[in-house]
A protein has these predicted regions:
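Compact, charge-rich alpha-helical regulatory domains located at protein termini
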Residues: 1-64
Length: 66
């Protein structure tokens, strides 16, 4: 299960199907999430950009379950 206290790297390593979700956020933040934020937790990443961590976690979990 994906949690907001996990790093982006851990999520991608365990759940490769989440790559598309992170790619969608590249346009939102104006840079590559998977290039620049691999060692941040989802909470840290969302806090940095004012994103809804609950929503992002839900999107990642949906990708994980599909």
């Amino acid at each position: 299960m994906i949690r907001s206290d996990m790093t982006i790297l851990d999520i991608l390593c365990d759940h490769q199907e989440t790559q598309e979700v992170f790619r969608r956020y590249d346009d939102v933040i104006g840079e590559c999430v998977m290039c620049n934020h691999m060692f941040e937790t989802l909470e840290e990443f969302c806090s940095r950009y004012g994103l809804d961590s609950t929503r992002l976690t839900a999107e990642l979990q949906a990708a994980e379950n599909n």
